[in-house]
């Protein structure tokens, strides 16, 4: 599809390379959504960091597990709650502590979407169609996370197939026609409900892609910072 078919006003904001990208958190200059579709609120002392980065010359976000988290708002178009099409949710995480509380919530939206690490460092994912604990998808401890190491996590829906990938390798997959719902609950990075099960570590390149299953088989994780 051609983006320009006649004279036009040049872009006045940063470009998003892929139109299906609905959210991209890439904290080079600030903690903001590079797709410019959502707003991000920082809680505690969540901040950018160069202590641990996935790619040289970039920045990550550090959450220390004591009140730090990010909350994404105005996500009507960017989040995939109730969405029946393909989607991809992915990010890099560098966990630094395996015993911070009972669980560590990596990315959540109410009860309906929870990507988390168990006390035994097991990567888990639950999805609910009515934002309750009645889950149609329950991937429990499908992979043992490695502490102090960057790992690429991806949740993909391709048709009716849901797959959880770690570092480009499928760790769990199931077929379901159900669609998850997080109701009106906000999307949060590094916590559940604003106070529960905080995650500790560094985060980078959180991207939400709507209308496209970026990964449909095992793949090589991104080798450079995401730009779109």
Where do the protein language model's features map onto the residues?
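Extracellular glycan-recognition modules
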Residues: 3-5, 66-127, 147, 161-162, ...
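Localized edge beta-strand/strand-to-loop motifs within extracellular or lumenal beta-rich domains
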Residues: 149-163
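Beta-strand-rich interaction surfaces with strong enrichment in secreted/lumenal proteins
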Residues: 76-78, 140-144, 176-177
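Extracellular beta-rich ligand/substrate-recognition surface
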Residues: 60-70, 127-136
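Extended recognition patches within non-cytosolic domains
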Residues: 1-39, 43, 48-59, 100-101, ...
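Solvent-exposed strand-to-loop "edge" motifs in beta-rich extracellular domains
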Residues: 27-30, 92-98, 155-158
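Extracellular glycan-interaction patches encoded by glycine-rich segments
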Residues: 74-76, 128-134, 140, 182-204
């Amino acid at each position: 599809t051609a983006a320009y078919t006649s004279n036009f006003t040049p872009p006045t904001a940063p470009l998003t390379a892929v139109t299906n990208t609905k959210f991209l958190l890439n904290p080079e200059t600030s903690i903001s959504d590079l797709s410019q579709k959502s707003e991000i609120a920082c809680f505690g002392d969540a901040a950018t960091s160069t202590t641990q980065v996935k790619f040289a010359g970039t920045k990550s976000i550090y959450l220390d597990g004591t009140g730090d988290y990010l909350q994404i708002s105005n996500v009507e178009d960017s989040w995939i709650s109730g969405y029946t099409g393909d989607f991809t949710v992915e990010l890099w995480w560098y966990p630094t502590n395996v015993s911070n509380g009972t669980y560590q919530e990596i990315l959540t939206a109410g009860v309906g979407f929870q990507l988390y690490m168990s006390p035994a460092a097991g990567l888990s994912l639950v999805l609910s169609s009515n934002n309750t604990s009645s889950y149609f998808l329950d991937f429990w401890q499908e992979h043992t996370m490695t502490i102090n190491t960057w790992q690429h996590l991806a949740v993909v829906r391709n048709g009716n197939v849901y797959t959880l990938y770690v570092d480009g390798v499928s760790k769990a997959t199931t077929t379901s026609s159900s669609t998850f719902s997080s109701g009106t609950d906000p999307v949060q990075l590094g916590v559940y409900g604003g106070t529960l099960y905080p995650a500790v570590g560094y985060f980078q390149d959180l991207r939400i892609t709507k209308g496209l299953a970026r990964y449909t088989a095992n793949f090589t994780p991104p080798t450079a910072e995401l730009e779109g």
